[in-house]
């Protein structure tokens, strides 16, 4: 699998998970409609399906995916919630992305 394709797939997977978790948050914490649970469930189903498209073992996929998830969550924080990430948020995301790169690009037996 091409590295750019895999990274794009990780980003799509993360967006599906963030949307699937953010919509119930809106209902539970901000008093929005419980009907938001319907698209939330759909988004989480898409998230689970997207995870199956990665070619490596499930545990390695989840570990590598975590780095991208952190970065996408911080972009969401900024663009959707209107809160600019701190320097420490960005440093933490960079460390997570470096960890993801080691997992994805490391040699296999």
UniProtKB/Swiss-Prot annotation:
This protein's GO CC annotations: plasma membrane
Protein's cellular compartments: Cell inner membrane
Top-level lineage group: Bacteria
InterPro entries: UPF0060
TM segment ranges: 3-23, 33-53, 62-82, 87-107
Major localization class: membrane
Bilayer topology term: Multi-pass membrane protein
Alphabetized Pfam families for the sequence: UPF0060
Keyword Membrane recorded: yes
Keywords: Cell inner membrane, Cell membrane, Membrane, Transmembrane, Transmembrane helix
Similarity comment: family membership: Belongs to the UPF0060 family.
HAMAP family for this protein: UPF0060 (MF_00010)
The name this protein goes by in its record: UPF0060 membrane protein MXAN_4406
Organism expressing this protein natively: Myxococcus xanthus (strain DK1622)
């Amino acid at each position: 699998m091409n590295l750019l394709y895999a990274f794009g797939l990780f980003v799509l997977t993360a967006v599906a998970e963030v949307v699937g978790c953010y919509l119930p948050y809106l209902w539970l914490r901000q008093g929005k409609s419980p009907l938001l649970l319907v698209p939330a469930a759909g988004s989480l189903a898409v998230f689970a399906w997207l995870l199956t498209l990665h070619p490596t073992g499930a545990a390695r996929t989840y570990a590598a995916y975590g780095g991208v998830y952190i970065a996408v969550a911080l972009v969401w924080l900024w663009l959707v919630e209107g809160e600019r990430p701190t320097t420490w948020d960005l440093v933490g995301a960079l460390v997570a992305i470096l960890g993801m790169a080691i997992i994805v690009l490391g040699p296999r037996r």
